[in-house]
Swiss-Prot record:
PANTHER family: 30S RIBOSOMAL PROTEIN S20, SMALL RIBOSOMAL SUBUNIT PROTEIN BS20C. Binds directly to 16S ribosomal RNA. GO terms for cellular component: cytosol; small ribosomal subunit. GO terms for molecular function: small ribosomal subunit rRNA binding; structural constituent of ribosome. SUPFAM superfamilies: Ribosomal protein S20. HAMAP family: Ribosomal_bS20 (MF_00500). Belongs to the bacterial ribosomal protein bS20 family. It comes from Streptococcus uberis (strain ATCC BAA-854 / 0140J). The gene is rpsT. This is Small ribosomal subunit protein bS20.
Length: 77
């Protein structure tokens, strides 16, 4: 455990950030799985939106976001 006050604060902030980032990534994965189970236009838009949000927050790389959206679009038809 950290002994320096600022290091303790950073550790606490890192825990909060990790929880927030994990929740966002989980929501993205859930939206993708929902689309793959039932590929509709509405679910495609929801999945694309969640992928874009994860990309803009730095959770996934821009290339991965593009690749994932392209694969979903191909499944849409």
């Amino acid at each position: 455990m950290a002994n320096i006050k600022s290091a303790i604060k950073r550790a606490e902030l890192n825990v909060k950030a990790n929880e927030k980032n994990s929740a966002q990534k989980s929501a993205m994965r859930t939206a993708i799985k929902a689309f793959e189970a039932n590929p509709t236009e509405e679910l495609f838009r929801a999945a694309s939106s969640s992928i874009d949000k994860a990309e803009s927050k730095g959770l996934i790389h821009a290339n991965k976001a593009s690749r994932d959206k392209a694969r979903l679009a191909a499944k849409l038809g």
